[in-house]
């Protein structure tokens, strides 16, 4: 009998020891702080698809642009059928938050599909499509969207790299630099650099490009070319770091056609090595200076890894309570990210999609 009672404290002690040891090995997830989770029900105040689903089910976010530390833009497609079963089409929409993701307002756009953002400090170029393509200029200060062009879907009209005032523009025959503040002012790209990738910079008509392995600037207004920087090393490409609106970099590439042996070295314009890209880190990485975020491990148990020293040391955040099923992310410097989280709570009002804001904790 005494032995029978002795086993209970022993069993209890073993359980406590086990749970304590487990907690010691449970990853600590205080390296990110989720500061906002926006529910589209707050905007629409109704369920959709005949009352069966949260309003977020009708919104497909295809692009995220973060303008500054508090202004977030979501480019999306709104399924109008969800609100009215007789309207069988989608509408391109822009959602704007000025309080770091706590609330949003909707700006309807022409077209059925949201295609792209091109972000600068003062303006964004937005493209949507449907029966036609629509080009918008979004003012980051007034938060107003102005349609500046409507064209056919044959892609003969093309808007490209943008420095906040001047933008690369093609009509299918010739390539120009357009002054977005006065769109009647267009400067044709010179034949001497016609086949060289060029990028507007400085908001004064300057184009920067790599020629004969050196960097040059040509001003489309003065029509003068000057040597910008004589490079010490040889480079294969002069391109934006990741997306079209990211910083320009010098790139050296090895084994470009071999996925296993592929290697890409990224340098800034001072020829300082930033990082190396290979098969292991080629996709779903965001970079800002020495900061890297790996958001490739998505799904029902997503993980977000980030590093503040070019990937030498990593922190891993194990996302709890919601899933991340799409790779649509937006980042603000090395401070926070925005993405869509899915909460599975059955018929509870807590179920459905939310626009999440996660702050990185250094």
Which ranges hold each PLM region?
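A short loop-to-beta-strand structural motif that recurs across blades of beta-propeller domains
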Residues: 92-96, 134-136, 174-176, 214-216, ...
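Conserved Ser/Thr-centered positions that define the repeating blades of beta-propeller domains
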Residues: 97-98, 161, 307-308, 358
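Beta-strand-rich domains and repeat architectures in extracellular enzymes and scaffolds
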Residues: 52-84, 89
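Repeated scaffold domains used in trafficking and secretory/extracellular systems
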Residues: 58-65, 111-121, 153-164, 192-204, ...
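Blade-level signature of beta-propeller repeat domains, shared across WD40, Kelch, NHL, RCC1
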Residues: 326-362
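Short glycine/acidic-enriched loop and turn motifs that connect beta-strands
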Residues: 78-84, 129-132, 254-258, 298-300, ...
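A short helix->beta-strand "capping" segment at the edge of beta-propeller domains
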Residues: 27-58
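C-terminal motif of bacterial Sec signal peptides marking the signal peptidase cleavage site
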Residues: 20-21
């Amino acid at each position: 009998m005494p032995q029978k009672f002795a086993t209970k404290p022993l069993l209890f002690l073993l359980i406590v020891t086990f749970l304590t040891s487990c907690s010691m090995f449970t990853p600590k997830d205080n390296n990110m702080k989720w500061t906002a989770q926006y529910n589209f029900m707050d905007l629409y105040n109704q369920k959709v698809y005949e009352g069966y689903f949260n309003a977020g089910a009708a919104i497909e976010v295809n692009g995220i642009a973060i303008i500054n530390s508090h202004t977030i833009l979501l480019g999306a497609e709104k399924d109008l059928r969800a609100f009215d079963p007789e309207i069988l089409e989608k509408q391109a929409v822009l959602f704007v938050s000025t309080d770091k993701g706590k609330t949003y307002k909707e700006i309807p756009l022409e077209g059925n599909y949201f295609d792209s953002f091109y972000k600068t400090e003062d303006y964004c170029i937005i493209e949507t499509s449907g029966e036609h393509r629509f080009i918008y200029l979004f003012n980051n200060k007034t938060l107003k969207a102005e349609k500046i062009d409507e064209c056919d879907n044959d892609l003969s009209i093309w808007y490209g790299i943008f420095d906040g005032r001047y933008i690369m523009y093609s009509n299918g025959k010739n390539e120009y630099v357009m002054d977005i503040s006065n769109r009647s002012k267009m400067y044709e790209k010179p034949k001497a650099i016609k086949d060289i990738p060029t990028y507007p910079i400085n908001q004064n008509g300057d184009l920067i490009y790599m020629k004969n392995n050196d960097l040059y600037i040509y001003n489309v207004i003065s029509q003068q070319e000057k040597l910008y920087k004589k490079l010490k090393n040889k480079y294969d490409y002069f391109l934006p770091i990741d997306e079209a609106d990211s910083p320009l970099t010098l790139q050296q590439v090895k084994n470009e056609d071999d996925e296993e042996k592929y290697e890409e070295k990224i340098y800034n314009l001072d020829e300082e090595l930033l990082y190396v890209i290979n098969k292991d880190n080629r996709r779903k990485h965001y970079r800002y200076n020495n900061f890297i975020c790996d958001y490739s491990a998505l799904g029902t148990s997503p993980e977000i890894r980030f590093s503040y020293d070019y990937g030498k040391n990593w922190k891993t955040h194990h996302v709890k309570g919601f899933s991340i099923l799409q790779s649509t992310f937006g980042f603000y410097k090395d401070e926070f990210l925005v993405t869509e989280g899915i909460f599975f709570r059955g018929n509870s009002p807590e179920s459905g999609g939310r626009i999440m804001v996660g702050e990185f904790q250094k």
